[in-house]
């Protein structure tokens, strides 16, 4: 028996221009960078930016704090 997550048809695609209609970033607009159909989420350029702490590696002996976009739910965006 398979217990997978149902793939949802979304109204936005990669490279679409969208506007955020709900949440902390309401009113911001940007381009869709990535779509996650199984989770119903999208990553929008310049929206929902969070800080990510990276461990020290050979390339970065000090480690780093990187700001990057995180996914938001597709119901919180509309095409613009």
UniProtKB/Swiss-Prot annotation:
SUPFAM superfamilies: Translation proteins SH3-like domain (SSF50104)
Pfam families referenced in this protein's UniProt entry, alphabetically: KOW, ribosomal_L24
Source species, domain of life: Bacteria
GO annotations of cellular component type: ribonucleoprotein complex; ribosome
Assigned keywords, A-Z: Ribonucleoprotein, Ribosomal protein, RNA-binding, rRNA-binding
GO BP field: translation
Any one GO molecular function term: rRNA binding
Annotated signal peptide: none
Function of the molecule: One of two assembly initiator proteins, it binds directly to the 5'-end of the 23S rRNA, where it nucleates assembly of the 50S subunit.
Known partners and oligomeric status: Part of the 50S ribosomal subunit.
Family: Belongs to the universal ribosomal protein uL24 family.
PANTHER family: MITOCHONDRIAL RIBOSOMAL PROTEIN L24 (PTHR12903)
Protein name (record): Large ribosomal subunit protein uL24
Species assigned in the record: Chlorobaculum tepidum (strain ATCC 49652 / DSM 12025 / NBRC 103806 / TLS) (Chlorobium tepidum)
Gene: rplX
